[in-house]
């Protein structure tokens, strides 16, 4: 939907319904050893995952976007870590279905060039993750975020200096979690022959 003739303001809506079937390896009930103390085991009782995805995006000047939406999962397949009943020193991973798992999100992208020699670009995604593992359970939820920021300084003689930040909150999947992660990278680039040849010198994850 366009708000004006030059399409400076636009509204874009999307909806889709999807089905994801479990892989043969996820259904295979035989154990697959992954290390001396752990193994994978399939679950032949897995059900397909049904997903309803919808979003609406406001676009300004073909560059700035604000999106809100949701991904609603029924019988989402997740991996669970468990302890072997016969030997507590051994663990295994098995796939199981979550009865419901809904992700409600807002996403923002904002490129900006305040000066001829400075380019800034930032994006942010915030997510509310609501989970009901079994039909008789109550929902429990988490807030998640993903952030990226990029600053590029154009220097004389076709040099450029680029600083990057990436941040991810603690993530949750099955009965496990992944700790938050923040990285800062710095890259110096030199171009020759109208940009056809590029050399890069950089350091990733400077503060860790």
Model segments located where?
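Outer-membrane beta-barrel translocator domains and adjoining extracellular loop/strand segments
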Residues: 24-32, 37-40, 70-71, 76-87, ...
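Repeated loop/turn-to-beta-strand initiation elements of outer-membrane beta-barrel proteins
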Residues: 7-11, 62-68, 116-120, 156-163, ...
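Transmembrane beta-barrel architecture of outer membranes
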Residues: 10, 41, 51-53, 103-105, ...
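Gram-negative outer-membrane beta-barrel transporters
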Residues: 72, 90-168
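Transmembrane beta-strands of outer-membrane beta-barrel pores
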Residues: 3, 15-21, 31, 62, ...
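Outer-membrane beta-barrel signature, preferentially recognizing the C-terminal barrel domain
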Residues: 5, 17-74, 91-105, 111-113
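Conserved C-terminal beta-signal and adjacent last beta-strands/turns
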Residues: 140-208
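Residues on the lipid-exposed face of transmembrane beta-strands in outer-membrane beta-barrel proteins
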Residues: 1-5, 54-60, 106-112, 149-153, ...
């Amino acid at each position: 939907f366009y708000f004006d003739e030059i399409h400076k303001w636009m509204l874009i809506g999307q909806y889709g319904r999807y089905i994801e079937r479990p892989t043969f390896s996820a259904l295979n009930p035989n154990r697959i050893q992954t290390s001396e103390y752990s193994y994978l085991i399939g679950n032949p009782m897995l059900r397909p995952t049904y997903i309803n995805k919808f979003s609406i995006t406001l676009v300004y000047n073909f560059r700035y976007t604000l999106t809100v939406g949701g991904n609603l999962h029924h019988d989402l397949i997740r991996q669970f870590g468990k302890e072997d009943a016969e030997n507590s020193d051994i663990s295994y991973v098995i796939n199981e279905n979550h009865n419901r798992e809904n992700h409600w999100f807002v996403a923002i992208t904002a490129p900006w060039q305040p000066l001829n020699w400075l380019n800034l670009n930032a994006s942010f995604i915030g997510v509310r993750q609501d989970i009901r593992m079994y039909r008789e359970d109550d929902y429990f939820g988490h807030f998640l975020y993903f952030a990226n920021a990029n600053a590029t300084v154009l220097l004389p003689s076709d040099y450029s200096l680029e600083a990057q930040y990436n941040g991810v909150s603690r993530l949750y999947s099955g009965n496990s979690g992944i700790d938050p992660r923040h990285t800062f990278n710095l890259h110096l680039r030199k171009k020759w022959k109208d940009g056809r040849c590029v050399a890069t010198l950089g350091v990733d994850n400077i503060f860790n």
